[in-house]
A protein has these predicted regions:
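C-terminal edge-of-domain segments
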Residues: 1-3, 115, 119-217
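An N-terminal domain-cap segment
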Residues: 2-61, 71
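A generic structural signal for short beta-strands and their flanking turns/coil linkers
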Residues: 29, 48, 55-57, 75-79, ...
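Short, structured patches in soluble enzyme cores that scaffold and shape functional sites
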Residues: 35-37, 63, 83-85, 111-113, ...
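Catalytic micro-motifs at enzyme active sites that drive phosphoryl/nucleotidyl and oxygen chemistry
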Residues: 35-42, 69, 92-97, 140-142
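Short hydrophobic-aromatic micro-motifs
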Residues: 59-62, 81, 105-107, 153-154, ...
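Short, structured beta-strand-loop surface elements
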Residues: 65-126
């Protein structure tokens, strides 16, 4: 953590725990990556959602070498990655005190490109396993051309912070006599029934697909 990732608004909600930060990164399916693109008066912020993965204390990103965002990050530009999971809507007795229960991580830093073939293959497998655990052993390996045609970046998790809100609404004491309903609406990510493509047909759905889940168990 550095001065730029130190919480100033509601610092009591900070979670200074690497294990908790890693767990949130692993639980979330995707992140948002932001950079400043362009030069001079043409400079402008760009934020793109991306699938991510984690390898130890590094965050992995990947995509097409033609991606402006990834090329900008590869060239040494500072980037900002955010990951947020919503756990509940918080309904209070006044509009001002409505809120959300959430867990959020902010990562800042500079990315380095992974160019070694074997390291890239390992990273690409991590993306698949992050999204669908148990999948890599059931699909063909990436071809040399596919590996060459993918840009993989690694971002250190040295400069990051986590913030979370939990619990019920916090109302003004003067509103507590109101008959307005207040409390929480829990939120979770729903998972539908797997839909096979035409070539798969009526084949049995494998366990890693049928029992895919995300979040706290």
């Amino acid at each position: 953590m550095s001065d730029r990732t130190t919480l100033r608004r509601k610092p009591d909600r900070a979670i200074d725990n690497c294990q908790a930060i890693h767990a949130l990164i692993d639980e979330a399916v995707y992140c948002h990556v932001g950079v400043m693109a362009g030069d001079g008066t043409d400079a402008h912020p760009v934020v793109i959602p991306m699938l991510h993965a984690r390898h130890g204390d590094r965050l992995l990103l990947h995509g097409s070498p033609a991606s402006r965002l990834l090329r900008t990050a590869r060239d040494g530009m500072d980037l900002c990655v955010t990951i947020t999971l919503l756990d509940a809507l918080v309904l209070a007795r006044s509009g001002l005190h409505h809120s959300m229960n959430y867990r959020s991580v902010v990562v800042m830093g500079r990315a380095t490109e992974i160019t070694d073939h074997d390291e890239k293959v390992e990273a690409l497998d991590r993306f698949v396993e992050h999204a669908i655990p148990g999948r890599t052993v059931r699909i063909r390996p990436a071809t040399t051309q596919e590996v060459k045609g993918t840009l993989v970046l690694s971002v250190p998790l040295d400069d990051c912070s986590m913030k979370a809100r939990t619990g019920p609404p916090i109302d003004d004491e003067t509103d507590m006599d109101s008959d307005t309903w207040a409390g929480l609406i829990p939120l979770h990510q729903g998972v539908g029934i797997p839909i096979p493509d035409e070539a798969t047909g009526d084949a049995t759905v494998p366990g890693h697909v049928a029992f895919w889940s995300r979040g706290r168990r």
